[in-house]
Amino acid sequence: EPVPETVPIASREQIEKNNSAYMACPSGSVITSDTNLFNRSYWTNNGILWNENLFVTVLDNSRNVIMKISSLAEGAQENNATVYDWKNYYECVRHVEEYGISAIVRLCRV
């Protein structure tokens, strides 16, 4: 089935003109909760200590924190770095997280 004429599709010409620095980037934050603590989503987690390692289950609560990395592509001329052309750059999007963990440990013997 062909794509209907009413659906807007960017032409190749438009894609080459656009600057990818202004694209929308969806977050990895796909889990929502009604529970908030200090205006941040909060989930109770389970963990286990095994063989001197701590394993903890975590969920993303970073709420759309995204880092964009841009680097000069292989084969691109160094002097081309002053004039923006999307073909001269590699664009990467990273969703980063930082965790602070507090643990209350109960010693038991199995």
Curated annotation (Swiss-Prot):
Any Pfam family from its record, for instance, is Late_protein_L1
Gene Ontology MF: a single term: structural molecule activity
User: Which cell locations does it reside in?
Assistant: Virion
GTP-binding keyword on record = no
The protein's UniProt keywords, in alphabetical order, are: Capsid protein, Host-virus interaction, Late protein, Viral attachment to host cell, Virion, Virus entry into host cell
Complex formation: Self-assembles into homopentamers. The capsid has an icosahedral symmetry and consists of 72 capsomers, with each capsomer being a pentamer of L1. Interacts with the minor capsid protein L2; this interaction is necessary for viral genome encapsidation.
Q: What's the protein here called?
A: Major capsid protein L1
Species of origin reads Avian papillomavirus fpv-l
Q: What is the lineage of its organism?
A: Viruses, Monodnaviria, Shotokuvirae, Cossaviricota, Papovaviricetes
